[in-house]
A protein has these predicted regions:
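Acidic, glycine/proline-rich low-complexity segments that act as flexible tails and inter-domain linkers
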Residues: 1-4, 11-29, 35, 43-61, ...
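Catalytic-core signal marking the mid-to-C-terminal active-site face
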Residues: 3-4, 9, 19, 243, ...
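Active-site cofactor/substrate anionic-group-binding motifs, chiefly glycine-
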Residues: 46-99
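A generic, well-ordered mixed alpha/beta core segment in the N-terminal half of proteins
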Residues: 77-167
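Phosphate/diphosphate-binding glycine-rich loops and adjacent basic-rich segments that engage nucleotide
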Residues: 145-214
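N-terminal nucleophile
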Residues: 155, 159-162, 177, 231-247, ...
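Small-residue-enriched flexible segments
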Residues: 183-245, 256-258
Length: 334
């Protein structure tokens, strides 16, 4: 397995993005987001997704100079227009604003419409936690999953993120697509030549399968919790569209590529009710209870959400970030 130093990955991404119209500062910030995604083990939304984003820039579907702006506000809630800019930077600024509103009011909400793909949603949940806030955020997507009981794709696997801060930086976070596996995870599993650990969707004959390529071909990803994930997807799309005035899943499906997405950023300041120390104590008791569980397998381990990611970051910092050589070489030639 080839590994690349995190700093080298940032440098190469920065170089390519500057060539495609980003200001030097924005190119560096955007490059850090891509590299951190791979550093965190979410390779599908780091290096592996980078060439696709470059193709969108070349087709003019992403405006590297556009910045999201607030177009209306009420109390601690704001509606922003992303102007089809670079999704991760717009989303980052929106969550930063939600956190600032939360520090003032206890809760801050930014509804971001007309944006582009935000890559890894966990970036923004973690950002909120780093600022001492509970972070809740989600995005809609192009139609890429059938509603429960359907064959054709009319809903999105709209990723949902929840993060809880800890003062030692060991934050607790769930970042999950509403399909059993995100399409990025299907891609990375296929590229690694592996099967999924459990069925992740149906093949073209309607049979459950662990073959990621078969699910990518059929487009029939399985909602998490079956009908529950389907219902949750629909409600998240409704709420996001209503609050932002942006595009719903079915509208995004008419654009060809996955652009013009809608995202919601919610930040809550838990120190409005308890000190940092008091909140840490509550969190630590709950996590200790989880860790005290008896593993189902003798060699197994029970982990809290985000624990595995922190280990991956440490390993990749020390050894280098794993890369698919073909994709990495393509970036070097850009």
């Amino acid at each position: 397995m080839k590994r690349v130093a995190y700093e080298e990955m940032v440098a190469q991404f920065t170089r390519v993005l500057e060539k495609h119209g980003f200001t030097p500062a924005d190119a560096k910030d955007a490059a850090v987001i891509f590299a951190q995604n791979s550093l965190s083990g979410v390779y599908s939304h780091g290096l592996n997704r980078f060439p696709r984003v470059v193709s969108y820039l070349e087709k003019g579907e992403i405006d590297p100079l556009a910045r999201a702006e607030c177009i209306s506000r009420m109390g601690s809630m704001e509606r922003w227009d992303g102007h089809r800019g670079f999704g991760p930077l717009n989303a980052q600024r929106a969550m930063e604003r939600a956190c600032a509103l939360a520090k003032e009011n206890g809760v801050g909400i930014v509804a971001l419409g007309n944006n582009n793909h935000w890559m890894r949603g966990g970036t923004y949940g973690w950002l909120a936690a780093e600022k001492g806030c509970i972070g809740i955020c989600w995005s809609n997507t192009a139609p890429n999953m059938p509603a429960w009981g359907a064959k054709d794709c009319r809903i999105g696997n709209n990723p949902l993120i929840l993060a809880v801060p800890r003062s030692d930086g060991q934050h607790v976070m769930v970042d999950c697509a509403l399909s059993q596996f995100s399409y990025g995870k299907l891609e990375s599993t296929r590229l690694a030549g592996r099967q999924l650990p459990v069925p992740g969707g149906c093949d073209e004959d309607g049979q459950l399968t662990t073959d990621p390529a078969a699910i990518e071909k059929s487009g029939r990803a399985l909602p998490i919790g079956y009908w529950k994930g389907s219902g949750l997807s629909i409600l998240l799309d409704l709420i996001a569209t209503l609050l932002s005035g942006g595009n719903a899943v079915h509208t995004i499906g008419t654009f060809g590529d996955e652009i013009g997405l809608t995202q919601i950023m919610i930040a809550i300041d838990p120190t409005k009710f308890g000190t940092v120390e008091e909140n840490d104590a509550v969190i630590n008791v709950i996590l200790a209870e989880i860790k005290a569980s008896t593993p189902a397998r003798p060699d197994g381990e029970v982990r809290w959400p985000g624990e595995g990611m922190l280990r991956t970051i440490k390993e990749n910092r020390e050894l280098g970030v794993p890369v698919v050589e073909e994709i990495w070489e393509s970036v070097l030639k850009m």
